Swiss-Prot record:
GO biological process, one term: poly(A)+ mRNA export from nucleus
Region (Disordered): 1-126, 346-365, 408-428
Family membership: Belongs to the IWS1 family.
Primary localization: nucleus
Domain TFIIS N-terminal: 243-320
The protein, known as: Transcription factor iws1
Transcription regulation found in the keyword field: yes
Function: Transcription factor involved in RNA polymerase II transcription regulation. May function in both SPT15/TBP post-recruitment and recruitment steps of transcription.
Keyword Coiled coil: yes
Biased composition (Basic residues): 107-121, 408-417
Length: 428
């Protein structure tokens, strides 16, 4: 064997001996610990047996033996030091945390202060004071946190707060602006209503004094401009401006109607306003519009507008639909003989009335138009099923259809031919 191999074998033997010695030591320590625990358990059992007195031994004692007992003569063991007598050890603090720890005892003292019991009012005051103190303490904590932050973090936090303040929605401002606009619209409409009422009263006074009533005409452009604003429709109806419109459309004291410009403008405005039944009940404008449909003084186009308004406003009252399909039309069967006899009778009555009136007045009578609006529809006598069957059975290849097809075929053949002369000389 070489010297190197011998050295390696010696090293391996030394390592194995060291490991065996360590194992023996660990086993010895385990045995010693087990012996100690057994001895401790035996001592505790002996003490318990010594302290365990039976009831018979205690009953044999005589109480008279302890009459002249003096406790001062008995030797006492030295009192064991309590926890409060133990020395205190303070941990070394860093200079950065000293300021934080100095503020803690102040807060603890504030919380440990006893509070006096008072009545209900004083308790509420105390609660408010406590809340204020807590808010102040929170603000102080925030300030201390800001001081402790690094300058870079503090600048970043301040920038974030500024961005949040800029991007915060301004709903309260928008709501306040909307309220201001609504208030301005209400003021404008109320002012206009009062001016219209005063103008109507002034024109009535001037007309009764036989003077020209021009107050409403002067104010008409302003009224027309305001009442035609679509965003003010609800405000106009809520503030009962229709009452002033009714006063403008009423006849004057001399029973004359207002100017034609006023009638035309206000009637057109009434057709565009979304008037409901409660608005008609409050303003009573339906009566004056109905008067325009009955009276003979208004112009025909004014009467037509009034008729349309009355029919539109009366539908919800009488519960009638505005759809033409839902309209109930009376139907009657047509009898030619009855129609001829009735027509002859009506013509004879009309001629006799015209002759009597002409003889009475001594002049000719102007013919007038007759109302051609019918209230009763004729009954349909055709059978739709028979018409469809006859149409299907009718032959499609009739003489007229054949001629039409031939004509169309000739037109197509002419259009398909190329214009110009061919190479062979065709088309010359």
């Amino acid at each position: 064997m070489s010297e190197e191999e011998k050295a390696e074998l010696e090293n391996m033997q030394v390592e194995s001996e060291a490991k065996t010695s360590e194992n023996d030591q660990t086993i010895d320590t385990k045995v010693d610990v087990a012996d100690v625990t057994t001895h401790v358990d035996e001592d505790l059992d002996n003490k318990e047996e010594a302290l365990d007195f039976s009831e018979d031994e205690l009953s044999d004692l005589d109480e008279n033996q302890f009459e002249n007992f003096d406790e001062s003569k008995i030797g006492r063991e030295a009192e064991e030091p309590t926890i409060y007598n133990l020395p205190t050890f303070k941990k070394k603090q860093e200079p950065n945390t000293i300021e934080e720890n100095l503020e803690v005892p102040r807060k603890v003292r504030k919380e440990q202060k006893p509070r006096r019991r008072r009545g209900k009012r004083s308790s509420t005051v105390d609660a408010l004071n406590d809340e204020l103190n807590e808010l102040g303490e929170n603000e102080e904590e925030v300030l201390t946190e800001q001081k402790q932050l690094d300058p870079t973090l503090a600048a970043k936090k301040e920038l974030d707060l500024q961005m949040d303040a800029v991007l915060k929605p301004t709903r309260t401002k928008k709501r306040s602006n909307e309220d201001n606009l609504e208030q301005m619209a209400d003021d404008e409409v109320l002012r206009l209503r009062e001016q219209m009422r005063l103008a109507a009263l002034r024109d009535a006074e001037l007309n009764s004094e036989q003077l020209p009533a021009t107050e409403k005409l002067k104010m008409l452009p302003l009224v027309d401009a305001v009442l035609r604003k679509t965003h003010l429709y609800d405000t106009i109806l809520d503030n009962n401006v229709l009452d002033s419109v009714r006063m403008w459309l009423e006849p004057l004291p001399d029973r004359s109607l207002p100017a034609l410009n006023i009638q035309r403008s206000l009637m057109d405005i009434l057709t565009k306003l979304p008037i409901q039944t409660e608005h008609l009940r409050e303003s009573k404008i339906g009566r004056i519009v109905l008067f325009y449909t009955i009276s003979k003084k208004p112009e025909p186009f004014i009467k037509r507008i009034a008729d349309n308004l009355v029919s539109e406003w009366s539908r919800p009252i009488i519960k009638r639909s505005a759809n033409y399909r839902d309209r109930a039309v009376g139907v009657a069967s047509f009898n030619p003989e009855v129609f001829q006899t009735r027509r002859r009778r009506d013509l004879a009555a009309a001629e006799s009335n015209d002759d009597a009136q002409a003889s009475r007045t001594g002049r000719t009578v102007i013919p007038r138009s007759i109302d051609s609006r019918y209230q009763v529809a004729p009954r349909v006598r055709l059978n739709p099923t028979a018409m469809t069957i006859a149409g299907r059975m009718k032959p499609a290849d009739t003489e007229q259809v054949r001629k039409l097809k031939a004509k169309m075929k000739a037109i197509r053949s002419k259009s398909s031919k190329k214009s110009g002369v061919s190479i062979e000389g065709r088309g010359l």
